[in-house]
């Protein structure tokens, strides 16, 4: 399954707020619609499917990529669900987004693909590159690169940066301090339901 490129508002109307996909928030539905939908019995499969879709659309990854991350998480020590979230959060495109260097994860992926991003002073153009503690993230010292970063930083300041990252706004340097803690994921998600969804495939 390919990466979604359709209307983003349609997705957040169905799944709720997904800051990685879009900064927009879903409009509240009229009460009569909420009453009619709440009276329907929702299957457990659909609940798990929607949690899985939240991860896919928020992080902007394909079905195949998500399944791959689930398989890696299953082999790691610790809670499979939490390891899965940590793997997704440590992707370079997500780190760029969480540092406020891009307005969304798709925007961050563009920065990486177009070679605007340096990790430890080396150009990295792979959005799925897995960052690790003590990695230093910078934007290339080119006018276009710096302008893209500045526009995003100006609009992102109100959200703040999670505690596993640091950004020096004077030198424009981001630092990965540690692996992210579950409390700082910033996405309303039940990761255990995602693991259950893939229980027969992973």
Swiss-Prot record:
Domain S4 RNA-binding residues, every copy: 90-158
Keyword terms of this UniProt record: Chloroplast, Plastid, Ribonucleoprotein, Ribosomal protein, RNA-binding, rRNA-binding
GO molecular function terms attached to this record: rRNA binding; structural constituent of ribosome
The organism's place on the tree of life at top rank: Eukaryota
Gene3D superfamilies: Ribosomal Protein S4 Delta 41, Chain A, domain 1, RNA-binding S4 domain
Gene Ontology CC terms: chloroplast; small ribosomal subunit
CDD domains from the UniProt entry: S4
GO BP, one annotated term: ribosomal small subunit biogenesis
Pfam families in alphabetical order: Ribosomal_S4 (PF00163), S4 (PF01479)
Ribosomal protein recorded as keyword: yes
Localization annotation: Plastid, Chloroplast
Keyword Disulfide bond: no
NCBIfam families reported in the protein's UniProt record: PRK05327.1 (NF003717), rpsD_bact (TIGR01017)
Described purpose of this protein according to its UniProt entry: One of the primary rRNA binding proteins, it binds directly to 16S rRNA where it nucleates assembly of the body of the 30S subunit. With S5 and S12 plays an important role in translational accuracy.
Quaternary assembly: Part of the 30S ribosomal subunit. Contacts protein S5. The interaction surface between S4 and S5 is involved in control of translational fidelity.
PANTHER family: 30S 40S RIBOSOMAL PROTEIN, SMALL RIBOSOMAL SUBUNIT PROTEIN US4M
Protein name (database record): Small ribosomal subunit protein uS4c
Source organism phylogeny: Eukaryota, Viridiplantae, Streptophyta, Embryophyta, Anthocerotophyta
Gene (UniProt): rps4
């Amino acid at each position: 399954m390919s990466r979604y490129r359709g209307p983003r508002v349609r997705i957040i109307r169905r799944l709720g707020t997904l800051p990685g996909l879009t900064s927009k928030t879903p409009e509240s539905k009229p009460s009569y619609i909420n009453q009619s939908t709440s009276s329907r019995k929702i299957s457990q499969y659909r609940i798990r499917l929607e949690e899985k879709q939240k991860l896919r659309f928020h992080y902007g990854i394909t079905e195949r990529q998500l399944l791959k991350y689930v398989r890696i998480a299953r082999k790691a020590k610790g809670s499979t669900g939490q390891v899965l979230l940590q793997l997704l959060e440590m992707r370079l495109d997500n780190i760029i987004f969480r540092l406020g260097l891009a307005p969304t994860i798709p925007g961050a992926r563009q920065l990486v693909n177009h070679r605007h991003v340096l990790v430890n002073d080396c150009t990295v153009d792979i959005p799925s590159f897995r960052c690790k503690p003590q990695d230093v993230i910078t934007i290339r010292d080119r006018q276009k690169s710096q302008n893209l970063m500045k526009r995003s930083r100006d609009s992102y300041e109100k959200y703040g940066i999670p505690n596993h990252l640091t950004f020096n706004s004077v030198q424009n340097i981001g630092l990965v301090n540690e692996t992210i803690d579950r409390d700082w994921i910033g996405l309303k998600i039940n990761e255990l339901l995602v693991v259950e969804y893939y229980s027969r495939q992973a």
